[in-house]
């Protein structure tokens, strides 16, 4: 299945949630009515979904937040289920260690799609070596940096400015904005991750 490249507002309306697909400096467009489904005459969202529908929607929401396709997501779940500990938390940790997500968390890109583009365009180094695979898993202790060329990009400069304005910092990541680099210190705890994600619903879905 091809990656979605249409309006981000449409995805947000489909899931009824802000998927962080737009810059934090721009609020969701006034036309992006999250209480309504996509379409010119989108029906008002039902207040109650079946258990299966709730589980499916949660999976779709998380896939769209992290920009992961169905087969990738299923593989992440299988990997998470074989690890020790809570499967749902393991799943979120795997998604958080994706290189495109780490670039986003470090503040070098305003959205995950923008971070994915930086990685794909060979603008990111991991431990001094160029990596152009967005799904590359960053390990604790890895040093992630932008190339000399990417450091001059206006979009990167603007992203760092927005990061400073919004004070977005994460305990498991240490960033040196002046050097355009950061260290992935450790896997994040569940308490450090988005509270609006209910990973238990995803586990219930795949456990059937």
From Swiss-Prot:
Residues 97-158 form the S4 RNA-binding domain. InterPro entries: Ribosomal_uS4 (IPR022801), Ribosomal_uS4_bac-type (IPR005709), Ribosomal_uS4_CS (IPR018079), Ribosomal_uS4_N (IPR001912), S4_RNA-bd (IPR002942), S4_RNA-bd_sf (IPR036986). The keyword S-adenosyl-L-methionine does not apply. Keywords: Ribonucleoprotein, Ribosomal protein, RNA-binding, rRNA-binding. GO terms for molecular function: rRNA binding; structural constituent of ribosome. One of its GO terms (cellular component) is small ribosomal subunit. It holds the Pfam family Ribosomal_S4. It comes from the Bacteria. Gene3D superfamilies: Ribosomal Protein S4 Delta 41, Chain A, domain 1, RNA-binding S4 domain. CDD domains: S4. One of its GO terms (biological process) is translation. The keyword Ribonucleoprotein applies. Part of the 30S ribosomal subunit. Contacts protein S5. The interaction surface between S4 and S5 is involved in control of translational fidelity. One of the primary rRNA binding proteins, it binds directly to 16S rRNA where it nucleates assembly of the body of the 30S subunit. With S5 and S12 plays an important role in translational accuracy. Belongs to the universal ribosomal protein uS4 family. This is Small ribosomal subunit protein uS4. The gene is rpsD.
């Amino acid at each position: 299945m091809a990656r979605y490249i249409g309006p981000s507002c449409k995805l947000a309306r489909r899931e009824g949630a802000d998927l962080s697909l737009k810059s934090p400096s721009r609020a969701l467009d006034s036309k992006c009515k999250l209480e309504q489904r996509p379409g010119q005459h989108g029906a008002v969202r039902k207040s109650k979904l079946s258990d299966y529908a709730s589980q499916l929607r949660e999976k779709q929401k998380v896939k769209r937040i992290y920009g992961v396709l169905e087969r990738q997501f299923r593989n992440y779940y299988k990997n998470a289920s074989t690890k020790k500990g809570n499967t749902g938390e393991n799943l979120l940790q795997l998604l958080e260690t994706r290189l495109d997500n780490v670039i986003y968390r470090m503040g070098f890109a305003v959205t995950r799609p923008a971070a994915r583009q930086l990685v794909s365009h060979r603008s990111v180094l991991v431990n001094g070596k160029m990596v152009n695979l967005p799904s590359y898993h960053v390990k604790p202790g890895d040093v992630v940096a932008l190339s000399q060329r990417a450091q001059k990009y206006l979009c990167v400069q603007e992203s760092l400015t927005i990061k400073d304005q919004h004070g977005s910092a994460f305990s498991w990541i240490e960033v040196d904005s002046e050097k355009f680099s950061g260290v992935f210190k450790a896997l994040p705890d569940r308490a450090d991750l988005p509270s609006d994600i209910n990973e238990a619903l995803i586990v219930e879905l795949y456990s059937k």
